[in-house]
C-alpha cells in the first residue's frame, strides 16, 4: 500500500462518513479492477468486488495519477 496516497478529502471526509471502509480494500480494487474508466475532471474510476462488504462492489475514484485515492463508496448500480 506504500505506493498509494490519499487526498485530505479522503482522509477527513470519506473515512469519517464511511468509517467501515478500509484503505486496503481501495488499493485492492485499483490493483485488480473489474472495470476502470476515465472520469471528468482528470479523475479515474475503478470498480471491484469486496468480499468483506458482503460481496458488494466498491467504486474507487483516483486523481489523474491513478495512485492518489480521492473517494470510495459501495456502488449499488454497478453491473459487471
Feature annotation, model-predicted:
Residues 1-80:
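Ribonuclease/tRNase effector modules and their secretory precursors
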Amino acid at each position: 500500500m506504500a505506493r498509494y496516497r490519499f487526498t485530505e478529502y479522503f482522509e477527513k471526509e470519506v473515512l469519517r462518513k464511511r468509517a467501515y471502509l478500509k484503505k486496503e480494500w481501495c488499493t485492492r480494487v485499483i490493483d485488480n479492477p473489474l472495470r476502470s474508466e476515465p472520469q471528468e475532471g482528470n479523475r479515474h474510476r475503478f470498480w471491484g468486488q469486496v468480499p468483506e462488504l458482503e460481496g458488494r462492489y466498491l467504486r474507487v475514484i483516483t486523481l489523474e495519477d491513478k495512485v492518489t485515492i480521492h473517494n470510495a463508496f459501495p456502488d449499488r448500480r454497478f453491473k459487471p
